[in-house]
């Protein structure tokens, strides 16, 4: 119990005395007031509480709480000085509010206990058997008389299909017809004749909640049948309260078996009632231990426990409390809070920093999806290149995953424990890019940070720097970058001192650098510096066999981001995606799937063709019919993988013939590396005769 000292026995002190006397957890050690006629002193004496005009002896008893009601600031200050470090000194007004709230809380809890006890008594004191099933035909409620007449204990049947417990039941028919059936004769088991009333339970919105069955021996007649139907209102009210909550709620019985969940729970976890009701309490947990089971074991509530739930591993905070009626454990109630909605600040931060990101590499080669020959070649090249210190040039169209490759190369290298920094060379002006890359000295320019600033090359020392869109650099920046690659040192803007740096450079471009060299917009010497280890990443249209695996991974990601539970694509939808030419590559595929899932009905689990955004699926066919001069191979009736290989082999052969078997020109025309061309020629057994 908490020891309390009241200083001041006027009206406020007396009012607090009245409240605290009724509280079982409070022990009032004394009431003190300088005025011997104070009303609170007389009342305290009536209750056998010590009274005094001096509080100092009692403060030495180290009370837990001292309530000051005199209004004298000097007394309050002296109390604060003399109190024990564990003693709390509260102004009387604050204490009055706090203890009033405590009293109100206790009153509400007592009312709730009395109501729950009353409902339980009503349900189990009736002479009629009562069974309630949910919309999945599983037993939710089973009273004492039902146990007696059916011959099975409640614990044996809760959560089981009604047909398994009572094979002759007609309750599932009520779920289909929603039509009540009154006073129906039925044989229960082998000999017991009963009269039963079956009722659909429907909420005010017209939604079917389940079915209630009330039955009795035929000798008892049906005088009390209508009274039992009042339980429908009780059940509907309790269900509606839970279902109206925006917080996810789950209820289990004393054995840890799921009894009830609401719509918010299903939306958050991605689990339906069928997957939870009647199942163990740890069914919904993907990471962590069941707090329901812990509460049932300890009979104590738990709060603020982090875990992951559902197939999408939603991160949540869980509060669980036991349901105890008259000392008997009935189950537990859990409230689940979603804490995963804070994620989209990264994009805003990137814009604020003008698309320059200084992040640790997030991806590995395991995150790169691809089983096509071209993708496997690119992956093998990247893994080999990661083990070398050479500068790597990633080439590929926008959206093919060049940044993903850069992350993976860094994580595979011996620099993985140091920084990985990404810079978009096209996002900044020349002056701003120079100061970001190389840093600047104090006073280098107007608005420069006092004391200067390190550049990204210095920040990435002993790590990796990813220069995206390197083909967009100006001639001046190209010259400065060349110096860094040659000399392995930088000079800050406004400075003269050379600062050595040890940085692995990974560059990327989606433009034709060779053409830029021919046009004089890209330095040849820089080209040879960055092109020591080129890797060509194929566009999506050249690896259509990867669309299914990519879609599975992207749908999983979007499920986590949007809180959905979509399982995948129908075959028609997959064929539609495979027929498209994907100018935006994997980025466009993610966009298409994301839009489809946003507008997908929350209860639907599969993306159909009709759900996909309208795009030019016939574009490839139209393009090829308008005089391209390409002779298509006969692929009618072939499987997709075989048709793609035939098409690819035919295209390579025709391109070789067009360029008189010059392998360099052929590779350039096809947009692949020489090594990749050799690989495919060997794979398809294409003739080498006449090649130069």
UniProtKB/Swiss-Prot annotation:
Binding annotation for ATP: 396-403, 460-469
Keyword flag Isomerase: no
Record-annotated DNA-binding residue ranges: 663-682
GO CC terms in record: plasma membrane; protein-DNA complex
PROSITE patterns registered for this protein in UniProt: PAS (PS50112), SIGMA54_INTERACT_1 (PS00675), SIGMA54_INTERACT_2 (PS00676), SIGMA54_INTERACT_3 (PS00688), SIGMA54_INTERACT_4 (PS50045)
Sigma-54 factor interaction domain location: 368-598
Annotated PAS domain residues: 115-185, 234-305
Domain of life per record: Bacteria
A Pfam cross-reference name: HTH_8
Keyword list, A-Z: ATP-binding, Cell membrane, DNA-binding, Membrane, Nucleotide-binding, Repeat, Transcription, Transcription regulation, Transmembrane, Transmembrane helix, Two-component regulatory system
Main location, first listed in the record: membrane
PANTHER family associated with the record: SIGMA L-DEPENDENT TRANSCRIPTIONAL REGULATOR YQIR-RELATED, TRANSCRIPTIONAL REGULATORY PROTEIN
Name used for this protein in its record: Putative sigma L-dependent transcriptional regulator YqiR
Organism annotation: Bacillus subtilis (strain 168)
Name of the encoding gene: yqiR
């Amino acid at each position: 119990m908490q020891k309390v000292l009241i200083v001041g026995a006027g009206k406020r002190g007396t009012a607090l005395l009245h409240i605290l006397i009724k509280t079982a957890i409070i022990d009032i050690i004394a009431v003190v007031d300088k005025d011997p006629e104070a009303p609170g002193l007389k009342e305290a004496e009536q209750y056998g509480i010590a009274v005094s005009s001096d509080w100092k002896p009692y403060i030495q008893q180290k009370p837990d709480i001292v309530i000051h009601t005199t209004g004298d600031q000097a007394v309050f200050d002296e109390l604060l000085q003399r109190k024990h470090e564990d003693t709390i000194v509260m102004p009387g007004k604050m204490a009055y509010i706090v203890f009033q709230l405590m009293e109100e809380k206790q009153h509400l809890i007592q009312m709730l206990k009395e109501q729950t006890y009353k409902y339980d008594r009503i349900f189990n004191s009736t002479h009629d058997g009562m069974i309630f099933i949910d919309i999945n035909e599983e037993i939710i409620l089973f009273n004492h008389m039902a146990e007696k007449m059916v011959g099975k204990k409640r614990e044996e049947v809760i959560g089981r299909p009604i047909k398994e417990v009572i094979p002759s039941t007609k309750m599932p028919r009520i779920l289909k017809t929603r039509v009540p059936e009154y006073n129906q004769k039925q044989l229960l088991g082998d000999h017991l004749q009963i009269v039963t009333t079956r009722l659909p339970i429907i909420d005010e919105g017209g939604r079917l909640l389940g079915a209630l069955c009330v039955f009795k021996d035929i000798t008892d007649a049906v005088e009390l049948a209508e009274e039992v139907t009042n339980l429908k209102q009780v059940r509907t009210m309790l269900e509606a309260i839970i279902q109206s909550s925006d917080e996810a709620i789950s209820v289990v019985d004393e054995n840890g078996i799921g009894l009830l969940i609401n719509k918010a729970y299903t939306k958050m976890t991605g689990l339906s009632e069928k997957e939870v009701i009647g199942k163990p309490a740890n069914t919904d947990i993907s990471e962590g231990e069941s707090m329901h089971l812990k509460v049932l074991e300890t009979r104590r509530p738990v709060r603020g426990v982090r875990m992951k739930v559902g197939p999408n591993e939603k991160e949540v905070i869980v509060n669980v409390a036991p349901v105890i009626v008259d000392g008997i454990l009935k189950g537990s109630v859990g409230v689940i809070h979603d804490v995963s909605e804070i994620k989209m600040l990264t994009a805003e931060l990137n814009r604020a920093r003008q698309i320059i990101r200084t992040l640790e590499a997030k991806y590995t080669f395991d995150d790169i999806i691809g089983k096509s020959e071209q993708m496997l070649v690119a992956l093998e090249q990247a893994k080999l290149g990661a083990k070398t210190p050479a500068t790597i040039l990633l080439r590929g169209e926008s959206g093919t995953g060049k940044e993903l490759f850069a992350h993976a190369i860094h994580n595979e290298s011996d620099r993985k424990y140091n920084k990985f920094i990404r810079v978009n060379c096209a996002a900044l002006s020349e002056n701003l890019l120079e100061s970001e890359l190389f840093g600047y000295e104090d006073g280098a320019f107007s608005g420069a940070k006092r004391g200067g600033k390190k550049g990204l090359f210095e920040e990435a020392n002993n790590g990796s720097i990813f220069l995206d869109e390197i083909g967009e650099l100006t001639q001046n920046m190209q010259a400065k970058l060349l110096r860094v690659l040659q000399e392995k040192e930088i000079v800050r803007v406004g400075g003269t001192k050379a600062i050595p740096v040890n940085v692995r450079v990974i560059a990327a471009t989606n433009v034709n650098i060779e053409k830029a060299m021919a046009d004089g917009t890209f330095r040849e010497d820089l080209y040879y510096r960055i092109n020591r280890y080129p890797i060509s990443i194929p566009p999506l249209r050249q690896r259509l066999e990867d669309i299914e695996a990519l879609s599975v991974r992207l749908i999983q990601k979007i499920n986590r981001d949007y809180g959905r539970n979509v399982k995948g694509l129908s075959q028609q939808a997959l064929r539609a995606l495979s027929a498209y030419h994907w100018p935006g590559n994997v980025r466009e595929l993610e966009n298409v799937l994301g839009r489809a899932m946003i507008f997908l009905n929350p209860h639907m689990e599969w993306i159909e063709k009709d759900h996909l955004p309208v795009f030019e699926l016939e574009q490839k066919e139209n393009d090829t019919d308008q005089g391209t001069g390409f002779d298509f191979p006969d692929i009618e009736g072939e499987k997709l993988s075989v048709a793609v290989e035939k098409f690819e082999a035919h295209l390579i052969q025709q391109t070789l013939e067009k360029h008189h078997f010059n392998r360099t020109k052929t590779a350039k025309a096809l947009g692949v590396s020489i090594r990749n061309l050799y690989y495919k020629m060997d794979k398809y057994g294409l003739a080498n005769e006449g090649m130069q």
